[in-house]
Amino acid sequence: MISIGVYIHTRSEYPLRWASTEGHVEVVIYLVENGADLNVLKLFYVDKYLQVVKYLIENGSNIHVDDEFTLIYASKGGYLELVNLLIKNGADIHVNDDAPLKWASKNGHLEVVKYLVENGADIHAYNELVVYASEGGHLQIVKYLVKKGADIHAEDDEALKWASRSGHLEVVKYLVEKGANFRAENDYALRWACEKGHLEIVKYLVEKGADIHAEDEYALRWASRSGHLEVVKYLVENGADIHACNDYGLRKASRNRHLNVVKYLMENGANIHAKDDYALRLASVNGHFKLVKFLVENGANIHAKNNEALIRPLGEGHIKIVTYLE
């Protein structure tokens, strides 16, 4: 096509950029040999195409121009060969406070993590390094970083909290066995596990001594608010107080349409009239007809707080509820 006059420099070397990003090394070579300008390329456009990057480096592409992107993207994507090539050609392993190591840890690329650390990456550049790996459930990376001296207690034991929140039981167990403080921030790890419905983690932490009553029954309140019935049952069966904060659990379960949780709490003595029948008022204004019907059938006062259960849903357009309550 070039031999018949096709212009290859159109739109800022678009043909070259497209061939590079698609990994077509033969096309890249052909275009460059016919005058295409390498200087328009950014290596991070082609971060996973090793042969293209090799060719670009060998032909004068400046990898330092794009340090902020290229090595970071290669590490983030787990492209070990590319990471190796970039570092051997002078890319800065410490770019952006060791961001390549951060992203490799966060995305679960163990071999890249090992390579970066063995080549001088600083595991202490980010206090949250173990946190990132724990949040992602990357147990082998967590173990490797801890073995290399990373602090599992960084940011007030944030690693354990995020592993609990994200549902990674094996990571939670490992961190606790290594001395992570599951009582940090008034049992925040337990609360997060309850909020997200990770029953096995909840059980494990409670068995290890986490306090289900911390912060005025926050664990039960969060589990109820989020609708995790099995977690709610477990907590109540282990002594959690369903009346904490004026039956907060019942109120928030009503607000968020968790009928099964509402039923369970009431079967276990929750006060339907707490805070001037707040459960009914919340269910009503938020348009939860089945919940409203259930609460009324079980004695909720539709006239509480100056008929709020009747008036507020009207303003929200919940005509079915208004008609039912009238």
UniProtKB/Swiss-Prot annotation:
Highest taxon above the source species: Viruses
ANK repeat windows: 11-40, 42-65, 66-95, 96-125, 127-154, 155-184, 185-214, 216-244, 246-274, 275-304
UniProt xrefs under SUPFAM superfamilies: Ankyrin repeat
Cited InterPro entries: Ankyrin_rpt, Ankyrin_rpt-contain_sf
Keyword line: ANK repeat, Repeat
This protein's record includes keyword Repeat: yes
UniProt-listed Pfam families: Ank, Ank_2
Protein name: Putative ankyrin repeat protein L25
Lineage of origin: Viruses, Varidnaviria, Bamfordvirae, Nucleocytoviricota, Megaviricetes
